[in-house]
Amino acid sequence: TVMAASLTACGSGSTATTAAPTETNADTSAAASEAASEAAGSSDADVQKIIDRGVLKVGCKSDVPNFSLQNTATGEYEGFEDDLAYEIAGEIFGCSADEAKEKKLVEFQGVTAKTRGPLLENGEIDLVIATFTITEERKETYNFSTPYYTDAVGLLVNNDSGIESIEDLNGKIIGVAQSSTTKDGFTSYVEEQKLDVKPEFQEFDGYPALAQTLATKQIDCFSVDRAILSGYVNDSNHILPDRFCEQEYGVASAKENTGLADLVDKKVT
């Protein structure tokens, strides 16, 4: 069983879609299928479909250090969330996470906050493990596992910006990821705290673009979950002490795939 960690996020990643190699020889696929059947007994139809296919398809980020980052040299996805994908694949195919990785039983596809939902809904991927914040609204569309990470949204600013707190952001430009929950979380927080802070928001397609735009001072602040921001801290910027919109990440599956959802939840819990 994978212990639930203390991590979460509001934002999205890049649009890279390079997938790990998925070809396996017939012997490997047959062995994996047999081992999975022995381990799981009579599998649910949605899980059996993955076993028969011979690979678990997972949507992940490609630009979030520590969570999921695509190695530009090897094309491999590396990080906590990718390791979790191998743990789940091991459960499905009746092997260890290391064996699942060695046998390439996970096919990764890079997703963003904007693309991860549609890819899951149209069946191109089986799971989303991509800093996907659990909300009541999203639970109406997807199955979510027990949370595996909890965090709060943060604010990254340049050292020479003169911005020292959220109150200094009135009239400033805040960059956020497309389809993230950051903007709504920020707005709700300042209303709750009765702060007179009305910034302008600009949406971007990925975190590297946000970091670059902050560095070139085209925006005044880069806002997303603090754990994600930590991967973009350097000598010229810092994260403000303010934190808001605490949230939880979960593994998402299509609403109809209840067997897969149950298997994932048991593994994550």
Listing of model-derived features with the role each one plays in the protein:
Residues 88, 120-121, 169, 213-215, ...:
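Hydrophobic residues within well-ordered alpha-helices
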